[in-house]
Amino acid sequence: SIVQGQVYDDGPGMGVALSGGPGFGKTAVTVGFAREYERALAAQFPDAFNQTNEFIPVCYSSLLRGAGLKAQMHHILRFYGHPVSLRATGADLVDELILVMNTCKTHLLCLDQAQNLHVGDKRDDQVAACLKDIMDGAHCTLILTGIDIHETGPLAVATGGRRQTSNDRLQLARRFTVNRIQPLARGSQEWTDLLTTIETQLVLCDTKPGDLSHAMSDSIWDRSQGAIGVAFNLLRVAANTAINDGSERITRTLLRKVSPTIEHATLKRKVA
């Protein structure tokens, strides 16, 4: 609703922050939504994807660790294959990104690993101002995905119990809704819905409805502790194994063959 409203509304750019711990599925949710949004547009406006000026409704970029504004903007522009002058400043690249997004009619900008935008209080104010400029100049919806990004970085309006005084940071935070991504409860409707969705996307010849969402729901939860990201990784490896061995179906026996990841082992210790 926020994305569609932004396309047809002339108001200020709006945003969504997906915040939570590592392995909780923030990236999976973001990529899944972005993919479905672009597919819906492709089905509705197929000719738009064949026009002379490239139509790129969604931009996705995983931000760099320890990088400043200029490096981050350069990294995002690489998604478009856009050449960048070595003499350009961070502000120049912000303007360049806005120009490219408008040319490509990008409505949705997804910035993953957004905790890497946190570079220090004063510089966070500068980042907040630039993000606000991008949202307004490109008239886009911005999705920020990262570890606890509602507590630190350009979206944080309080640090150490003190309210931030930066107008840019406050204005940016007021435009964002925050979705806290948490592990899903065993047997919950949300957990069942997640596994059902994964079932519909499996490209396995012999998979059957309910294989994951009913028959192996508890087994998958035990291996992932309800963390969406861990569950996705587990089932992706299991699906590839089923393809490689010719079984074309995820079973309990096959699932036991998938070695637990370091991510899963670490998360399980934290929950315990």
Predicted regions and their residues:
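Phosphate-binding P-loop
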Residues: 3-13, 51
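Walker A/P-loop nucleotide-binding motif
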Residues: 10-32
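Post-Walker A helix-loop "phosphate-sensing" segment adjacent to the P-loop in P-loop NTPases
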Residues: 36-48, 82-83
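A short hydrophobic beta-strand->loop->alpha-helix junction that borders the nucleotide-binding pocket
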Residues: 49-50, 58-66
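Mid-core helix/loop region of P-loop NTP-binding domains shared across ATPases and GTPases
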Residues: 53-56, 67-75, 82-141, 187-190, ...
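C-terminal alpha-helical "lid" subdomain
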Residues: 185-272
